[in-house]
A protein has these predicted regions:
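Conserved redox-active cysteine motifs that mediate thiol-disulfide chemistry
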Residues: 27-41
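Conserved Rossmann-like nucleotide-binding pocket used by diverse enzymes
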Residues: 3, 8, 28, 54-56
């Protein structure tokens, strides 16, 4: 069972834009092999940063308007928002430690 909630077009503003604090969104699709590779890392980070970082997943096939709005050209894309403002995005599979370092830098700003 996943600890990571799904965000959709209809919940995007409430879950991401109006959220206080750091939010990490995993843009993915069911057919995407690299998305399946990074998914366990996203789950682990959700547990490790519980209460500090809101971790969400967005299915790009079902919510293509959000993916288009933020110009997501490749998946997986991990996007970071803080207090409703986009901070950064990472495209592709990256090591867990890289993501932890990125999260820590955003939490300490």
């Amino acid at each position: 069972m996943s600890d990571v909630s799904e965000v959709t077009t209809s919940t995007w503003d409430d879950e991401v834009i109006k959220a206080q604090g750091l939010v990490m969104i995993d843009f993915w699709a069911a057919w995407c092999g690299p998305c399946r590779i990074i998914s366990p890392t996203v789950e682990e980070l959700s547990k490790e940063y519980s209460g500090k970082v809101k971790v969400l997943k967005l299915n790009t096939d079902e919510n293509s308007d959000i993916a288009s709005r933020y110009q997501v050209m490749g998946i997986p894309t991990l996007m970071f928002f803080k207090d409703g403002t986009k901070l950064d995005q990472i495209v592709g599979v990256v090591p867990k430690q890289f993501l932890k370092d990125k999260i820590e830098s955003f939490l300490n700003k």
